[in-house]
Amino acid sequence: MTNLQDQTQQIVPFIRSLLMPTTGPASIPDDTLEKHTLRSETSTYNLTVGDTGSGLIVFFPGFPGSIVGAHYTLQSNGNLKFDQMLLTAQNLPASYNYCRLVSRSLTVRSSTLPGGVYALNGTINAVTFQGSLSELTDVSYNGLMSATANINDKIGNVLVGEGVTVLSLPTSYDLGYVRLGDPIPAIGLDPKMVATCDSSDRPRVYTITAADDYQFSSQYQPGGVTITLFSANIDAITSLSVGGELVFQTSVQGLVLGATIYFIGFDGTTVITRAVAADNGLTAGTDNLMPFNLVIPTNEITQPITSIKLEVVTSKSGGQAGDQMSWSASGSLAVTIHGGNYPGALRPVTLVAYERVATGSVVTVAGVSNFELIPNPELAKNLVTEYGRFDPGAMNYTKLILSERDRLGIKTVWPTREYTDFREYFMEVADLNSPLKIAGAFGFKDIIRAIRRIAVPVVSTLFPPAAPLAHAIGEGVDYLLGDEAQAASGTARAASGKARAASGRIRQLTLAADKGYEVVANLFQVPQNPVVDGILASPGVLRGAHNLDCVLREGATLFPVVITTVEDAMTPKALNSKIFAVIEGVREDLQPPSQRGSFIRTLSGHRVYGYAPDGVLPLETGRDYTVVPIDDVWDDSIMLSKDPIPPIVGNSGNLAIAYMDVFRPKVPIHVAMTGALNAFGEIEKVSFRSTKLATAHRLGLKLAGPGAFDVNTGPNWATFIKRFPHNPRDWDRLPYLNLPYLPPNAGRQYHLAMAASEFKETPELESAVRAMEAAANVDPLFQSALSVFMWLEENGIVTDMANFALSDPNAHRMRNFLANAPQAGSKSQRAKYGTAGYGVEARGPTPEEAQRAKDTRISKKMETMGIYFATPEWVALNGHRGPSPAQLKYWQNTREIPDPNEDYLDYVHAEKSRLASEEQILKAATSIYGAPGQAEPPQAFIDEVAKVYEINHGRGPNQEQMKDLLLTAMELKHRNPRRAPPKPKPKPNAPTQRPPGRLGRWIRTVSDEDLE
């Protein structure tokens, strides 16, 4: 973030470290300028699961020191038992004096099984509680989920094998360094004496007040009577002190008091015990003071303390059984936790509870804590420290992002797999130049984009040192061509060269540069400092493109622009190509600075911003438009570009504007429209078309030529966009030559633009074209060569053929190929390609073509019946079906075109049920059940057939019902004893009857008459 020389990536290291602590530490970019060193400290613990299989891990995610948390196991009696504290690998107070926590993340999961266990069982609940540990009322496994209502601060029932990740997010900023309680030099009689310097910043003070004139009364007992004078919740994991005094009054002589303070841990056990008074005698009739002055160092606090208790033991000197003892007490105590009110020290806390894990399993806690550390004087001799860098833009951006963390899906507890998946999203958040693709998928892009616009540019007006950062993020990078390329105000001067939407009819200068200057894509290098055609040029490098933001749900049409230069009057040179978008309205804020302020008027008086102001645009538009360069396009959004492209003109842009004015789409149309494609034999420059084609392919777009004639169909954007939803790359050659969805006015506008004098060819180019046409008319061989050239270019194999020619200089391989190629109509040709002509593969229509032909057939049939509203587009929207009877009734009654797929139930009469006769049902059942001559169908099957006739209102079964009836018949035949007996099979050994045969063709039968 602070390295402003790298203009291609603007990373905010602080927020990257916050969201992904494993990427390492980063200095907090606030105004606390202390020399420090950055350090990452790991924490790794393998915690053994207790007998009940349940436990609780308490994390202090924001604690600025070595303490990370504590582990408790659940006992069979339902109580928690402290196991151990969780610390960083290095004891920071041993080497460092001061500390600031930058970021921290911890992961809890289990991947090991004890002996005899073959499945990894158990689940985890986790919650971040915006309070202190002592304030939790229910720490049971399920009760933790009620600790907060914020869905981003709790997760439940995560498998222990998957694990959870705890992320530390700051609750405050611009914090000072905290003293770590490090040892200080000290000399004493006791060699074990330790002196430490504890934090005194932001202490937390608990005040405990005894009720005035608290009355105690009891009878004497041997050993004294013990009562709890008070018990209060406190929170402490660092050193604390207790101060104050209590006043006791009594009227009984010889009373003796003893007082003890107990510091109790989260599990209810006593951690520290301090005797305040022992055998303290009370004087009757006076105020007896009992002072409290305790100091508990950090090293004695072996587990988190959550409460304090004061017990008083009352006895009597020489007391006898039955003697009365009474006194009253008043006063207050103050418990001070050193550094306890530092943001993150004691609150919030994150609790991770696991349940039903196999006994003896190991739960692993692993994580990293990143710190800013100030070493002690001894270590500072060998450790280099640096000042923190003040970066208000980065700090402001971080604050705004985390203030919207609930809306941006940034949680404090995560399933580990989900957190890993979100790392790419976090990288987008940390990179101010990222296009926010993943954020857009989650729906967070608008918020982050608004934060970027607010957080960084405003800073330059308050803090001048941050102005370069503001320009880089807000208004765009000043593309530095050198010192002379900027005016006194710091604003880059615009170039006078013009980018043109180049086609076969246009050859215009894009970047004004003399010979000797090398212009390659966006890299502009010059050897000296001349002024060329108004461009101030100086030694230097034109810096790379910087993406603006994405525009969501914006209708747009796209077209390519070829960036050219001119070496001489006849040979324009294509250098690069860029996709532009036509957006409705005045949207100069989306344009790069090099395009702003330039516009052209249309014939209807409207403006097109981003066009060069050359005359009048020969189009009639109904509104203003803006053309902007883009770097990428998605389903419903476009990513803008900051490339320093000057204003443009050209046929491709005019065609895209015409489409935009007619269709007015709600989302970008994923087709690159260009005027460089045609089918009339016009000579085209190969490099221009290839450059546009490559540019369209990089974005996954089709390169579409204009419709060359008017089609009598109305504009139907829904049908148009339905045909091209996924933009395959195999439609590159004139896919829209016969576009049936081009409305008449768009065609007329296109022809008007092509006929305008402004878009005629240059005289030199016209002369060259006429010369080539004349040569082709005179020389048939040259005409054939031009045809071959156009065929190669149209099919996109110019480069392939050129490479083939280099490998076959004598054309031997080509001659052999042509000699052995199948001829039109030959057997091999028909076997391979069907009956199509030579070299043309005979194929059936594509599904889209077949569907379109079907829609046309239905429409023509409806037209013959006088139903003129059923156009092919209407049929397509109606589910590729003709109008239903209800739609026809609606049209006949209202003479309004019915909406496709509308039922219009009000125009349909209820269908009368027609009952089939029993004879008809029996005949159908017999026909379905079996062949004639077999046994009659059973009554159960006849009933099934009758049900079908009843459902169909007297009509017979449809195909699906017929299948069901046939299956039913087969089942009944197999289990019906009344089925017809099988036909007897012929016996193989039985003699066959001799058929009456003829004696012969020439043998005459002797009759009785002959014998007479």
Curated annotation (Swiss-Prot):
> What broad taxonomic lineage does this protein's source fall under?
Viruses, Riboviria, Orthornavirae, Birnaviridae, Avibirnavirus
Keywords, ordered alphabetically: Capsid protein, Host cytoplasm, Hydrolase, Metal-binding, Protease, Serine protease, T=13 icosahedral capsid protein, Virion
Which terms under GO biological process does the entry name?
proteolysis
According to the record, the residues making up region (Disordered) are 969-1012
**What Gene Ontology cellular-component terms does the record carry?**
host cell cytoplasm; T=13 icosahedral viral capsid
Show the active-site residues. Answer: S652 (nucleophile), K692
Taxonomically, which superkingdom?
Viruses
Q: What does this protein do?
A: Capsid protein VP2 self assembles to form an icosahedral capsid with a T=13 symmetry, about 70 nm in diameter, and consisting of 260 VP2 trimers. The capsid encapsulates the genomic dsRNA. VP2 is also involved in attachment and entry into the host cell by interacting with host ITGA4/ITGB1.
**How is the polypeptide modified once translated?**
Specific enzymatic cleavages yield mature proteins. The capsid assembly seems to be regulated by polyprotein processing. The protease VP4 cleaves itself off the polyprotein, thus releasing pre-VP2 and VP3 within the infected cell. During capsid assembly, the C-terminus of pre-VP2 is further processed by VP4, giving rise to VP2, the external capsid protein and three small peptides that all stay closely associated with the capsid.
* Leading EC class: hydrolase
Annotated region Interaction with VP1 protein: the residues are 1003-1012
Query: Recorded GO terms, molecular function?
Result: metal ion binding; serine-type peptidase activity; structural molecule activity
- Which parts of the sequence bind a divalent metal cation? D30
Protein name stated in the entry = Structural polyprotein
Cross-referenced SUPFAM superfamilies, in alphabetical order? Positive stranded ssRNA viruses
Q: What is its EC number?
A: 3.4.21.-
Q: Which InterPro entries match?
A: Birna_VP2, Birna_VP3, Birna_VP3_dom1, Birna_VP3_dom2, Birna_VP4_Prtase_dom, Viral_coat
**Feature type site, description Cleavage:** A441, F442, A487, A488, A494, A495, A501, A502, A512, A513, A755, A756
> Biased-composition ranges for Basic residues?
975-986
Where is the Peptidase S50 domain positioned along the sequence?
A: 513-755
State the Pfam families in the record: Birna_VP2, Birna_VP3, Birna_VP4
